[in-house]
């Protein structure tokens, strides 16, 4: 495993999102099971931290952009800055939805359709953002997630307000369609991994990459689908599981997603105005990390020392042979000594 490559391709934005979602899901499961009696405003603390980092990072990045006009002429700088602004807009709509959810749970004074209204707005915005990101070759994960689930948001809001009385298994039909597509993606990676394993024309690095991708997708999608099935069955009253066993598959998926951020390139360089890779930024702030990052270990060090200490024997020197008549000195190389040819007397006829 190339640790240097993993940290150079580290995506801090996705790592923060997955870590906050993991901590939030743990707190939510504990709160629903009654193990902790915190307010839901405290349970949502990881979500508030996530949105706070987004707002602060975008504010600092905008300040750096405004104070340094010379940066705007650097390659894809304008594209990255606009992508950051689009992401901030989507996150603000999500923040508004989360605040309304907490207020609705704590006070219960308004309809769920009103609570879901920011998500109804974020879906068309995400569709436009997907088109813009696709044209500029940007990542689309959050935008796609918000845009394809508009029908699911509507069904959930109607079901919570008891406008429709469908079972939750039917309410989540858009979710099952999306998960079916993800299962096809997993099957695609598995088939390609098998083909690459059986092919003799593929180098080992490509085989390893495809196997890693297949295992990653399988570890993400299968537990996530398991969590959704268990949750729907609990909401419909078909099982009496507590929330912690139901959330365990979700935690496994989120941990896998956190692990995949160490091998993903990307990330907007304008968050907090750093304008460079996160790994390089850390090395500039903490120079002592360079010393530990540049250490190399030689596992054959002792053998090399023995080789250096043992003197190499010199080849034996063979004394030169003299021939008096020709006055020529012939020196033989070691291991290649050969007798001189006999003297030939050729008699000339009269």
Curated annotation (Swiss-Prot):
It is found in: Cell projection, Dendrite; Membrane. The keyword Signal does not apply. It holds the Pfam family Tmemb_185A. The chain crosses the membrane at residues 16-36, 41-61, 81-101, 111-131, 177-197, 211-231, 240-260. Keywords: Cell projection, Membrane, Transmembrane, Transmembrane helix. Residues 298-350 are annotated as: Mediates interaction with MAP1B. It comes from the Eukaryota. GO terms for cellular component: dendrite; membrane. It is a multi-pass membrane protein. Belongs to the TMEM185 family. Interacts with MAP1B. This is Transmembrane protein 185A. It comes from Pongo abelii. The lineage of its organism: Eukaryota, Metazoa, Chordata, Craniata, Vertebrata.
């Amino acid at each position: 495993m190339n640790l240097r490559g993993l940290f150079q391709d580290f995506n801090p934005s996705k790592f923060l999102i997955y870590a906050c979602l993991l901590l939030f899901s743990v707190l939510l499961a504990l709160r629903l099971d009654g193990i902790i009696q915190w307010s839901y405003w405290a349970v949502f603390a990881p979500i508030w931290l996530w949105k706070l980092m987004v707002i602060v990072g975008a504010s600092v990045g905008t300040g750096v952009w405004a104070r340094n006009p010379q940066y705007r002429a650097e390659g894809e700088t304008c594209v990255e800055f606009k992508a950051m602004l689009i992401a901030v807009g989507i996150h603000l709509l999500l923040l508004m939805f989360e605040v309304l959810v907490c207020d609705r749970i704590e006070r219960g004074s308004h309809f769920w359709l009103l609570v879901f209204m920011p998500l109804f707005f974020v879906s068309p915005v995400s569709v436009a953002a997907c088109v813009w990101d696709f044209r500029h070759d940007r990542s689309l994960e959050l935008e796609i997630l918000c845009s394809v689930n508009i029908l699911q948001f509507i069904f959930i809001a109607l079901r919570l307000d008891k406008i429709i009385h469908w079972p939750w298994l039917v309410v989540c039909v858009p979710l099952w369609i999306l998960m079916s597509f993800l299962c096809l993606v997993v099957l695609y990676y598995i088939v390609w991994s098998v083909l690459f394993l059986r092919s003799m024309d593929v180098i080992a690095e490509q085989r390893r990459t495809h196997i890693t991708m297949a295992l990653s997708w399988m570890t993400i999608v299968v537990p996530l689908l398991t969590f959704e099935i268990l949750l729907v069955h609990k909401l419909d009253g078909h099982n009496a599981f507590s929330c912690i066993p139901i959330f365990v598959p979700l935690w496994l998926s989120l941990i896998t997603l956190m692990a995949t951020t160490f091998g993903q390139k990307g990330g907007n360089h304008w968050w907090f105005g750093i304008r460079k890779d996160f790994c390089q930024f850390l090395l500039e702030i903490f120079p002592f990390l360079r010393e530990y990052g540049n250490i190399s270990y030689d596992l054959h060090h002792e053998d090399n020392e023995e080789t250096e200490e043992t003197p190499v024997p010199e080849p034996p020197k063979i004394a030169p042979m003299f021939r008096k008549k020709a006055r020529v000195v012939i020196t033989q190389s070691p291991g290649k000594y050969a007798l001189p040819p006999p003297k030939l007397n050729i008699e000339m006829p009269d």
